[in-house]
Amino acid sequence: MIPAASSTPPGDALFPSVAPQDFWRSQVTGYSGSVTRHLSHRANNFKRHPKRRKCIRPSPPPPPNTPCPLELVDFGDLHPQRSFRELLFNGCILFGIEFSYAMETAYVTPVLLQMGLPDQLYSLVWFISPILGFLLQPLLGAWSDRCTSRFGRRRPFILVLAIGALLGLSLLLNGRDIGIALADVTGNHKWGLLLTVCGVVLMDFSADSADNPSHAYMMDVCSPADQDRGLNIHALLAGLGGGFGYVVGGIHWDKTGFGRALGGQLRVIYLFTAVTLSVTTVLTLVSIPERPLRPPSEKRAAMKSPSLPLPPSPPVLPEEGPGDSLPSHTATNFSSPISPPSPLTPKYGSFISRDSSLTGISEFASSFGTANIDSVLIDCFTGGHDSYLAIPGSVPRPPISVSFPRAPDGFYRQDRGLLEGREGALTSGCDGDILRVGSLDTSKPRSSGILKRPQTLAIPDAAGGGGPETSRRRNVTFSQQVANILLNGVKYESELTGSSERAEQPLSVGRLCSTICNMPKALRTLCVNHFLGWLSFEGMLLFYTDFMGEVVFQGDPKAPHTSEAYQKYNSGVTMGCWGMCIYAFSAAFYSAILEKLEEFLSVRTLYFIAYLAFGLGTGLATLSRNLYVVLSLCITYGILFSTLCTLPYSLLCDYYQSKKFAGSSADGTRRGMGVDISLLSCQYFLAQILVSLVLGPLTSAVGSANGVMYFSSLVSFLGCLYSSLFVIYEIPPSDAADEEHRPLLLNV
C-alpha cells in the first residue's frame, strides 16, 4: 500500500529514504548529493578549450523500456550525428563555388585589359557586385530565415544562386566571342566588355551570396557537435575547389589537342567550371534532408498538443512489508515483461556539456530513435493548477509510484517572472487503482513552478500479449519545457512561455536596419575584424595574377599580341594561377588541422597567427623577384583564407549560446542566425567595394601592381592588432552570472 502524500514528511518527499532505494544504491552512489551540481548554458564559460566532454553529475539508473511507435513522436528537430559523407556532400557547393571563383579571379583582369579597358577603370568592375551584395545580402538572409518552401529554407536559395553563378560564368568567359558575334570588331569590343562586366557582376554576386545559405544550411541540419566539423569541412572543400580551379587555369590548353578542338583556353575553362559547379550543386541539394519551416500561423502540435506521445516513468518500489509480494516488473533489473531492454539506454541526469551548448541533451534525446524507446518521467516542480490524471480502475495494475530525488525547499528561486516552484506529489487512492500526479497547491489559477503547466501525455501500450494489458493507455505527466529540451535542444524562456506563438513581425528594410544598428557589441567587433581580414585578402586575391604578370615577369598586357612583353604577361598570369593553387591547397591543409590546433591554441592566438602570416607574406612578396620565393609565400595566404571561412562563424555559434545575445521574442530583440551570418558576409562586400575604389588609383599612382601588395600587407597588420585587442572571444559572465547557480531546467 502506498502511503498518502499528506502522510509523507516533507524531507522524505524531497529526498526518499535509503531503505526503499536499496535497488538504486549500487549504481548511483551519492546521487542525492549531486543536486547542487547542475548545468546551465554557461557552464563552460564559452571556452572552446579543452574540447573534452565532461560529465556534470552522476547518472541515476536507467528506467524500464517501453515500446512506442516512432511515427507517433515528432523528432524532426533533433539532429543526429552526421556522417563524414553527409557533411562532405553538404559542403560540395563550396568546392564548386570556389572552383568558379578561381577562374574568375584569375582571368577577369587579364581578359578586360586585353579587350582595351583602361587601367583606371578595371578595378571598378568589382564595384557593382559588392554594392548589390551589401544591400541584398541581409535581405536574402532574413528571407531565408522565414522561407516556408517545401524544399526547406536554404536549399531554394542555394539552387537559384548556383544558377545565377553559372549564367554569369557563361557571360564572363564567352563575352568576347558573343560580342564578336553581335557587332564587335577588332580593336573595338564594346559589346564584349559590356557582357563580360555583366557576367562578372552576376557571377561575383551569386558566388558570394551562395556561401551564406550553405553555411546556414549546415548549421540548421547539424547538432552543435557537428557544426565545428562541418565548418572545417566547408573550408577544406573551398580550399580544394580553389586549388583545382587554379590547376585547370594554369594549364596551357591552347597547346593541347583538346584545347584546340574546343576553341581555345577560355572554352576549356568554361567547360570544366560549368560541369563542376552543376555536379557539386546537385550533391549539396541531396546531401541532408532539410525540414520545411512551418508557417507562423501553424501551431506546433509536437510542443503544444496534450496528446504528445511520450513514455511513462520508471517504477520505484515502496518499502517491502512482511506480507507484501513483489510485482511482476521490479526496479531491480530495470526491465519488465512488457518492455524488453533497449540496446541503447539514455542515462538520465548525466547531461553533458560541450562549448556551453546542450549537446548532451540532444544526444540523450536522439537515443530514443531505437526499436524500443526508453521511458522517462522527469518528476520536478510544477506547482500549478493541474487536473489529476487517472488510469482507469478497471485495469489491473500493481500499486506503484515513482519519484526521482528532488531539490530541497527554496532551492529554486524566483527570477524574471518565474515564481518559486512548489513541490509536486504522487498520490494513490486506498484501493491502489488510481495513480494521481498533481500539485499540493491546487487552488492557484495558473502555473507557478519553474516549469510550465504539465501536459497529459497519452501513450498506447503496443507491446505484450492479449487481454486488457495490451489495450490500456498510460497517462504520463510531462512538463512542456522538459519536452522542449528532449525534442528541440536549447530553447529560451521567451519561446517556452508562449511568446513564440505570436505572429512574427513582417520583414521590412527599417526593421532590418534596426537589427544592423542595434547589433551586440560582440558581433560588431567581430564584423570589424572580419572586414579588415577580407580587405587585406581581397586586395591580394583580385590582382595577384596581374601582379605576377607585370611585376614578377615584367610583362605588358596592352602590348601587341605578337610581342615578347605580351607573351611574358600571359606566362605570368599562368604562373599566378599556380601560385593561387598553392594558396588554395595550403588553405585546405590548414582547414584540416585547424580543429586540432583549436585544442592547443585559443581563437585569439589563431587569429593573430593568420593575420601576421598574411602580412609578412604579402610584404615580402614585393621585396623579391625570385619566382620560387614568391610562390612559396602563397602558403601564408591560405592560412588567412581558412581562418576567415571558419573562426568567425564558429564564434558566432558560441555567441548564440548567450541568451542576452540571442534576444527574446517577447520584446522584439530576437536575432536570426541567417541575418547575422549575412551581416558577417556583408563585411566581405564592404571590403570589396573599398578595394575596387582604392586599388585602381593606387596602382596608377605607384606605377605597378606592387601597390596592391603594400596595401594588403598594411591592412593585415592592422587586423592583427585589432583581433588581439578588441574582438570579444567570450561573452562576459556578468550579464547572467546568477545563472551559474541554478539547476539545468530553469533556464534551458
UniProtKB/Swiss-Prot annotation:
Positions of the UniProt region annotated as Disordered: 294-339
GO annotation, biological process:
D-glucose transmembrane transport; galactose transmembrane transport
TM helices/strands, residue ranges: 93-113, 123-143, 155-175, 191-211, 233-253, 268-288, 533-553, 573-593, 600-620, 627-647, 685-705, 708-728
Gene3D superfamilies documented for this protein: MFS general substrate transporter like domains
Q: Mutating I56T has which effect?
A: In IDDNPF; no effect on protein abundance; no effect on glucose transport activity
Catalysed reaction(s)? D-galactose(in) + H(+)(in) = D-galactose(out) + H(+)(out); D-glucose(out) + H(+)(out) = D-glucose(in) + H(+)(in)
Could you tell me which InterPro entries the record lists for this protein?
Answer: MFS, MFS_trans_sf
State which tissues express it.
Expressed in adult heart, brain, muscle and kidney, with very strong expression in brain. Also expressed in fetal brain, kidney and lung.
Task: Answer whether the UniProt record assigns the keyword Membrane to this protein.
Answer: yes
* CDD domains attached to this UniProt entry: MFS_SLC45_SUC
Major localization listed first in the record, in broad terms:
membrane
**Family indicated by similarity:** Belongs to the glycoside-pentoside-hexuronide (GPH) cation symporter transporter (TC 2.A.2) family.
Q: What does this protein do?
A: Proton-associated glucose transporter in the brain.
Instruction: Report the protein name in the record.
Output: Proton-associated sugar transporter A
Q: Which organism is it from?
A: Homo sapiens (Human)
Q: Which gene encodes it?
A: SLC45A1
